[in-house]
UniProtKB/Swiss-Prot annotation:
Keywords: Cell membrane, Membrane, Repeat, Transmembrane, Transmembrane helix, Transport. GO terms for biological process: potassium ion transport. It comes from the Bacteria. This is Putative transport protein YbjL. InterPro entries: AAE_transporter, RCK_C, RCK_C_sf, Transp_YbjL_put, YidE_YbjL. The keyword ATP-binding does not apply. It comes from Escherichia coli O1:K1 / APEC. It holds the Pfam family TrkA_C. One of its GO terms (molecular function) is monoatomic cation transmembrane transporter activity. The keyword RNA-binding does not apply. It is found in: Cell membrane. The chain crosses the membrane at residues 8-28, 32-52, 66-86, 94-114, 158-178, 383-403, 406-426, 451-471, 475-495, 540-560. Residues 200-288, 292-373 form the RCK C-terminal domain.
């Protein structure tokens, strides 16, 4: 039996898509020296090669992939977006204006220099900026410009041609730039991300070692009785000195939970709970006594639970005011908006904060009831919330603003980004709502991005050879200039005028360019999601400005002579 692979792939969009993804992901794992190509470039190269062989895919797949990615970016950025935006919103607006404004001016200059018409110039701007809103804005303005039909048809054709010829140039150049531009500065992105995390209490080091408390039991001997000198447990302050807590005492065969007034006596058997290093700090008079291995005395179920702060008697209080150790519990982590914070007695608790607490199961339950509730982890995604907010995002994207003779809309991407931010923000403040496991979120985000890249390559590859004629070289040069020069200008402005943190700055630059694949590379370089906060800050603003740029370039073109 003969199988025609070309016909098989052409007749099955789903098969073609996953063949492209599989081959591209394999290619992305290849290394050239110390440089790994990466998934984005691997999928793009494979899809471009197959696109040149006239394989095509339904454009709905491209759109769905991009929308899933943008929505997930919003969900990840949501917990901290508003605190970051209200603090840096002016900077994000100015960065987006500098990026879009400089690209617009450069594109107009190059268009006049090479003698192109408005269609090629606007298409080159849209492609170099990898921005569909520019294309939409320019096309809509051309249709309402009053051109005669033949001239309008040529301009619209050239608009698409310019976009097709420069889109890949803009995308690849920015992806490469995102990988190497951070290395040209003195401060690496990982350090910058850690710096902003420390400054704003967004400690993202989730790999910190956390030890569970352990239980050891000792028999009180003469040395220990002499050390206590008749003082009760409150006066001894064993926890303050060592970090260990006397959980139980067996006296005359009777087990009891001691209070602060208890005094240790000869022959008592005591169970101490604490971290390993806390046991090491105990006075030698504890350890010199005979250690006891008593099943009943040591029979404690140590658990670690995540307690959500909710009750009014805990919200607004300092961490020290909870007095967890007085209740035999140990604090391991403080998590706010899905970001781990430094453990500090002066941290003021907010509603929705998550405290990771260890201790005896009964004591942890008592503490949880007092300050909130125990978070029940699940590996099941709240698909209802996911789908509902996705629909809300699409509806927001349909909103259109009309100004005299031109109009611009939010677009699906901006709407979904905003909806994702809202879902992430609400999940952070109401942990029982909209739960999405991080693994599921990462998988959907990565899959959406790869589908988008596959669609771009297959769509652009089929027609790119047709445009490489007399203007091919000019388009390559112009595309590179418009793609990279505004990025450099934006970096200099953000770094030396606005003095922004580098991790937020690079994320914001990728958002101002509305380039999702490049943002993913920046996040990988920083080994943090903090750049996504900057990306989300400029993305929605840039989408509006880019739509206006498409309109403005058509409107000012005739006046340039």
């Amino acid at each position: 039996m003969n199988i025609n692979v070309a016909e098989l792939l052409n007749g099955n969009y789903i098969l073609l898509l996953f063949v492209v993804l599989a081959l591209g992901l394999c290619l992305g794992k290849l290394r050239l020296g110390s440089i790994q190509l990466g998934n984005s470039i691997g999928v793009l190269v494979v899809s471009l090669l197959l696109g040149q062989q006239h394989f095509s895919i339904n454009t709905d797949a491209l759109n769905l992939g991009f929308m899933l990615f943008i929505f997930c970016v919003g969900v990840e950025a949501g917990p901290n977006f508003f605190s970051i935006f209200f603090r840096d919103g002016k900077n994000y607006l100015m960065l987006a204006l500098v990026m879009v404004g400089s690209a617009l001016v450069i594109a107009l200059g190059l268009g006049k220099l090479f003698g192109w018409d408005i269609g090629l110039t606007a298409g080159m701007l849209a492609g170099s900026m990898t921005s569909t809103p520019v294309l939409v804005g320019a096309g809509d303005t051309l249709r309402h410009s009053g051109m005669e039909s033949r001239q309008l048809s040529l301009a619209l054709d050239n608009l698409s041609l310019g976009y097709a010829l420069t889109y890949l140039i803009g995308l690849v150049s920015l992806i490469v730039g995102a990988r190497y531009l951070p290395k040209l500065q003195h401060q690496d992105l990982q350090t910058s991300a850690q710096q902003i995390a420390r400054e704003r209490g967004l400690d993202t080091d989730a790999n910190r070692k956390v030890y569970l408390p352990v239980i050891r039991a000792y028999r009180v001997g003469p040395e220990l009785v002499a050390w206590t000198d008749g003082k009760n447990l409150r006066e001894l302050g064993i926890y303050r000195q060592t970090g260990c807590y006397i959980e139980r005492i067996r006296r005359n065969g009777i087990l009891a939970n001691p209070d602060g007034d208890a005094v240790l006596q000869m022959g008592d058997e005591i169970a101490l709970v604490g971290y390993p290093d806390a046991h090491a700090r105990l006075d030698p008079s504890f350890r010199n006594g005979k250690e006891v291995f008593d099943r009943d005395l040591l029979d404690m179920r140590i658990v670690t639970e995540e307690v959500v702060v909710k009750n009014h008697n805990a919200v607004g209080k300092r961490l020290a005011q909870l007095k967890l150790t007085d209740h035999g519990c140990f604090l391991n982590r403080v998590i706010r908006s899905q970001i781990e914070m430094p453990i500090d007695d002066n941290v003021v608790l907010n509603k929705g904060d998550v405290l990771q607490v260890s201790g005896d199961a009964r004591r942890v339950k008592t503490i949880a009831d007092r300050i909130g509730f125990i978070s029940i982890h699940s590996q099941v995604t709240d698909l209802l919330a996911f789908c509902a907010f996705f629909v809300i995002g699409l509806m927001i994207g349909m909103i259109t603003f009309q100004f005299s003779t031109f109009s611009f809309g939010m677009g699906n991407a901006a709407g979904l980004l905003f909806a994702g931010i809202m879902l992430g923000f609400m999940r952070a403040n109401h942990p029982t709502f909209g739960y999405i496991p991080q693994g599921a979120l990462s998988m959907v985000k990565e899959f959406g991005l790869m589908v988008f890249m596959a669609g771009v390559g297959l769509s652009a590859g089929s027609g790119i050879n047709n445009g490489l004629g007399a203007i091919g070289g000019q388009m390559l040069i112009a595309g590179l200039i418009v793609s990279l020069v505004p990025v450099v200008i934006c970096f200099l402005f953000g770094a030396y005028v606005l003095r922004m943190n580098r991790a937020l700055l690079f994320g914001a630059m990728m958002g101002a360019r509305t380039c999702a694949p490049a943002m993913e590379i920046i996040s990988d370089t920083a080994r943090s999601n903090i750049p996504a906060l900057g990306y989300a800050g400029t993305y929605a603003i840039a989408n509006v400005l880019l739509t206006l740029a498409g309109t403005i370039i058509v409107m000012v073109w005739p006046g340039l002579g």
